[in-house]
Amino acid sequence: MENRKIIEVRNLVKNYGSFEAVKGISFEVYEGEIFGLLGPNGAGKSTTLEIIETLREKSGGEVYVNGYDLDKDKDKIKRIIGVQLQASGFYPGLKLSELIELFSGLYNEPVDPHTLLKLVKLEDKTKNKFKELSGGQKQRFSIATTLINKPKIIFLDEPTTGLDPQARRNLWDLVKDIRCKGTTVIITTHYMDEAE
């Protein structure tokens, strides 16, 4: 059985004045896929994701997410995408369980912190504060928060930047596990080996 398209981008353009940050990119992502946007810093990868996430306006082109038109259905699109926050997006002094409860309230989605942390192998850190985590643990926790609203798609922007080789492998095992549970994963990276 062929997977269906969950994201379709056609000739996407984003201009900032005379600077063209995204230059007519087109691609398709299929349900259950891990899809990577590869390119150097400044190539427009993050901007492309931010447009699809409805965080930025596009200058041209078409975007469809799960059949919804970005120009007409932004609220519906927002509900099916989980977005990874960078470490600076978390209150460092709160316990992981408190942060999950905070995000759970924002999404109006009841979640058991222990169950969610178990998915990312952090169940023993429930009472730890965010600032007490290692770099790899912080990345895994940020991925856990993308799963709170049970999204069809998650976006991970440069998820392994700054991680040591073992933490990178652990993160990739987690991403593959998330995909195996039916969630489509979109990543940006400037590492060729990750894109492969």
Question: Which role does the model predict for each range below?
Answer:
Residues G61-D69, K76-I77:
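Conserved ABC transporter NBD signature motif
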Residues E101, G105, P110-T126:
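Conserved ABC ATPase "signature" region
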Residues K129-L133:
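Conserved ABC ATPase signature
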Residues I143:
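Hydrophobic anchor residue at the start of the ABC signature
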Residues K150:
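Conserved catalytic motifs of ABC-family nucleotide-binding domains
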Residues I154-D157:
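Catalytic Walker B motif of ABC-type/P-loop ATPase nucleotide-binding domains
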